Regions:
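N-terminal Rossmann-like FAD-binding beta1-loop-alpha1 element of flavoenzymes
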Residues: 7-32
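Flavin-dependent oxidoreductases
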Residues: 19, 166-252, 256-265
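Glycine-rich FAD pyrophosphate-binding loop
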Residues: 26-45
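Dinucleotide-binding Rossmann-like beta1-alpha1 core, especially the glycine-rich loop
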Residues: 48-123
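Short beta-strand to alpha-helix junction loop
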Residues: 58-68, 126-142, 241-245, 305
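A short coil-to-beta-strand element that immediately follows conserved catalytic motifs
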Residues: 84-87, 154, 259-271
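Helical element adjacent to the flavin cofactor pocket in flavoenzyme catalytic cores
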Residues: 123, 127-169, 175
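C-terminal catalytic lobe of FAD-dependent flavoproteins
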Residues: 142, 264-323
Length: 323
C-alpha cells in the first residue's frame, strides 16, 4: 500500500469522472465514485464520439487538454477492446469555418483541405483528417473495468450537496456534468440536449462531421457494426425522450450525403444532455474543510479533453499535500 495513499471521492461516472478516478486509482489512491447513473446511462455513453473538431473555452487550456487526450487515444486505439480506433474522414461546413483549422485539428499533421469532388452538395469547405473515434458504450465499459481493476469503488448513490461530499472525504472531485447546476448552484451550466440515431452500419469506414452553429447538423461515425448518426442541439432542454421527427430529420440529412443510409436499419435512438457553459470549470475550491476540484461544463467536447482534464484535476487535488 502506498503510504501517501489518500482517500478521494469523485462525483459522477461520465467520461470526466471515470477518467479522473482512474488516474487517481492507478496512482495508488483509494477512490470512490458516487454516481446517480450507471456509466452506461450517462450522457457520455450517448456521445458520437470523435476527437478534435469542436471548440472549447478557455482556448489555450482546452488545446493542451485535447493534445494530452489525443496521445492517450492513439495508444488506446492499438487495442480493439477499448472501443477506440483511428479513422479517416471529413470535417465539413456549409459556410467557412469560424476558425481554421477548427478546434484542435491544428495540432495534427496530415490534415488537408478537401478537393472540390470530395465534398457533398451544399458544403463550402472541408478538411480530410485521420482522427480517433470512440465507441462510447464500449469505451465506458472499458473505463469502468479499468477503474475497478485499479482498486476503485463505484457506488450508485446521488450526492445531494457539496456539504455531504465534504463530510465524506477531505478530497473531492466534482464531475457532475449538468448536475453541477444544482449541486454547486451554478446557473451558468445548462443542458443542451442532443439526439443520436444508431443504425446498422452498411459498410462505411469513414466518418463525416458537419460543423454548424445552428441546432442541427449532419454527422456519422462508424464503430464496426454500429453507425452513430447525428445530430442536434437544443438549449435548456432536460428531456431525454427521443423525438421520432428528429430521428427522421437525422436520417434524411445523413441519407442526402450517403444514400445507402436511407435503407439503414435503426437500432436505437438516444438523447444526452451536454453540460454547456461559457467555459470549462476546472479549478480548486476549499469548502467546509475539504479540497474540492471542480471539473464540469465541457459541453459537447468532454470526450476530446477527457484525459487532459483528468490529469490536471488529479494534479490540482493532490498539489502541496503534506508528505
Amino acid at each position: 500500500v502506498n503510504e501517501r495513499s489518500r482517500s478521494v471521492l469523485v462525483i459522477g461516472a461520465g467520461v470526466q469522472g471515470l477518467s479522473t478516478a482512474t488516474v487517481l486509482a492507478e496512482a495508488g489512491h483509494r477512490v470512490r465514485v458516487r454516481t446517480s447513473e450507471h456509466p452506461s446511462g450517462t450522457t457520455s455513453a450517448v456521445a458520437g464520439a470523435v476527437w478534435g473538431p469542436t471548440s472549447l473555452w478557455p482556448v489555450e487550456r482546452a488545446r493542451r487538454w485535447a493534445e494530452r487526450t489525443y496521445g492517450v487515444f492513439l495508444e488506446l486505439a492499438t487495442d480493439p477492446a477499448t472501443g477506440v480506433h483511428s479513422a479517416s474522414g471529413i470535417v465539413a461546413g456549409r459556410t467557412e469555418f469560424p476558425e481554421s483549422p477548427p478546434g484542435a485539428l491544428g495540432l495534427l499533421d496530415g490534415v488537408r483541405p478537401c478537393g472540390a469532388g470530395e465534398l457533398p452538395p451544399g458544403f463550402a469547405v472541408g478538411l480530410r483528417a485521420t482522427l480517433p473515434l470512440v465507441d462510447m458504450p464500449r469505451y465506458m465499459e472499458y473505463l469502468s473495468d479499468r477503474f475497478l481493476n485499479a482498486g476503485g469503488e463505484l457506488v450508485h448513490s446521488t450526492v445531494q450537496s457539496l456539504s455531504e461530499a465534504a463530510a465524506e472525504s477531505s478530497l473531492v472531485v466534482n464531475c457532475a456534468g449538468v448536475g453541477a447546476r444544482e449541486l454547486v448552484g451554478d446557473p451558468g451550466v445548462r443542458p443542451v440536449s442532443g439526439q443520436h440515431v444508431i443504425v446498422e452500419n452498411p459498410g462505411l469506414e469513414e466518418f463525416f462531421v458537419e460543423l454548424s452553429d445552428v441546432g442541427e447538423w449532419t454527422s456519422y461515425m462508424p464503430h464496426g457494426q454500429r453507425l452513430v448518426l447525428g445530430g442536434t442541439a437544443v438549449e435548456h432542454d432536460w428531456d431525454r425522450t427521443p423525438d421520432p421527427q428528429v430521428t427522421e430529420g437525422i436520417l434524411r440529412r445523413c441519407g442526402a450525403i450517403q444514400p445507402v443510409l436511407h435503407e439503414a436499419r435503426v437500432r436505437e435512438e438516444l438523447v444526452g444532455l451536454r453540460p454547456r457553459s461559457d467555459s470549462v470549470r476546472l479549478h480548486t475550491e476549499h469548502y467546509e474543510g475539504a479540497r474540492i476540484v471542480h471539473d464540469y461544463g465541457h459541453g459537447g467536447s468532454g470526450v476530446m479533453v477527457s484525459w487532459g482534464c483528468a490529469y490536471e484535476a488529479a494534479g490540482l487535488l493532490l498539489a502541496d499535500l503534506d508528505d
